[in-house]
Curated annotation (Swiss-Prot):
One of its GO terms (molecular function) is homoserine O-succinyltransferase activity. Keywords: Acyltransferase, Amino-acid biosynthesis, Cytoplasm, Methionine biosynthesis, Transferase. NCBIfam families: metA. The record marks E111 as: Important for acyl-CoA specificity. This is Homoserine O-acetyltransferase. The gene is metAA. It is an enzyme of class 2 (transferase). The active site is at C142, H235, E237. It catalyses: L-homoserine + acetyl-CoA = O-acetyl-L-homoserine + CoA. The keyword Transferase applies.
Amino acid sequence: MPINIPKDLPAKEILEQENIFVMDEERAYSQDIRPLNIIILNLMPEKEKAETQLLRLLGNSPLQVNVTFLRPATHEPKTTSKHHLEQFYTIFPHIRHRKFDGMIITGAPVEQLPFEEVTYWDELTDIMEWTKTNVTSTLHICWGAQAGLYYHYGIPKYPLPEKCFGVFNHTVEAKNVKLLRGFDDVFRMPHSRHTDVKREDIEKVPDLTILSMSDKAGVCLVASNDGRRIFLTGHPEYDATTLKEEYERDLAKGLPIHIPESYFPNDDPSQPPLNTWRSHANLLFVNWLNYYVYQETPYEWE
């Protein structure tokens, strides 16, 4: 089934060219079924790229999904046009009265700041508190995962000696978990971050279960016991070339950066990288939508 998105959203044409099933609002409203309402708090600097990446994964399930894009009202993005934000995004005061079946909180390029120094931290904590009563399941990605673990459970983040940057192998730590249903014993996922959370901190929290680990990238996937909060430290939504673009950007800025690990063929940046994580990325999102959102959300919110 398709994702339901605004007719003029730039991602629509890209997704249609990739044979992703999308539907504009006029067609969706004529169908007599209950779609899932998913809200995406997009904190990424290149919002249009993040939109396409996430919609690509949300559109690969048998469920119809209505998507609402949310941005912080207390932060003015520098890399997304005001017109785009006004046309396709809303702010928290406009939707806080609503109920949503699922939510995604993306990463953000603020991980080296203390949480409380992020300009929109107070607003983000209001949103995360609101999810406890107004969202069936929330998927937190990268910095969003670190922020969620810190807010909900007091788990700190730690600076890494060098950036965790590349595509890494991960193992399934928890058996018979619906989120990882159909996963191989070992799967790959991109990471791009300067900070980390520690396994021992998470294991001290009875309400949390570590679902997946990586020998090199550390904790990958954590879930609350009721499935209402999922924390993902990697970036399964990334395109094949996203790490390449980040690498070239940092090189151009003169920042200390190493070649993304296990990414370029023969570690040669002149060779085009291959996407080796796409199938598990799609499976992860389908499992989340089906088992943690669709199967758990009420047909009619009270």
